[in-house]
Amino acid sequence: NVYQYRKMLQCAMPNGGPFECCQTHDNCYGEAEKLKACTSTHSSPYFK
């Protein structure tokens, strides 16, 4: 649930929040997409 997710984020990132976590995650995928070895049939880690 959302409460447990928030507690997990507080444990891993005590001074951060869900928006910072999601931004870091998205930036990581953005950089990985630039690597030839990391390309796939999907242009995004999120299925549309």
Curated annotation (Swiss-Prot):
Q: Which reaction does it catalyse?
A: a 1,2-diacyl-sn-glycero-3-phosphocholine + H2O = a 1-acyl-sn-glycero-3-phosphocholine + a fatty acid + H(+)
- Similarity comment text for this entry: Belongs to the phospholipase A2 family. Group I subfamily. D49 sub-subfamily.
- The catalytic site is made up of H25
Q: Which cofactor does it need?
A: Ca(2+)
Under InterPro entries, the record lists:
PLipase_A2_dom_sf, PLipase_A2_His_AS
The record's listing under SUPFAM superfamilies reads: Phospholipase A2, PLA2
What does the subunit section of this Swiss-Prot or TrEMBL entry state? Monomer.
In Swiss-Prot or TrEMBL terms, this protein is called Phospholipase A2 TI-Nh
User: Keywords, A to Z?
Assistant: Blood coagulation cascade inhibiting toxin, Calcium, Disulfide bond, Hemostasis impairing toxin, Hydrolase, Metal-binding, Platelet aggregation inhibiting toxin, Secreted, Toxin
Which stretches are transmembrane?
Answer: none
Q: Where in the cell is it found?
A: Secreted
The entry's other comment says: Negative results: does not exert detectable effects on both the intrinsic and extrinsic pathways of the coagulation cascade (up to 50 nM). Does not hydrolyze either fibrinogen or thrombin. Does not have impact on already formed fibrin clot. Is not toxic to PC12 tumor cells (up to 15 uM), but evokes neurite outgrowth in these cells (1 uM). Has not effect on ADP-induced platelet aggregation. The active site (His-25) is not easily accessible for modification by 4-bromophenacyl bromide (BPB).
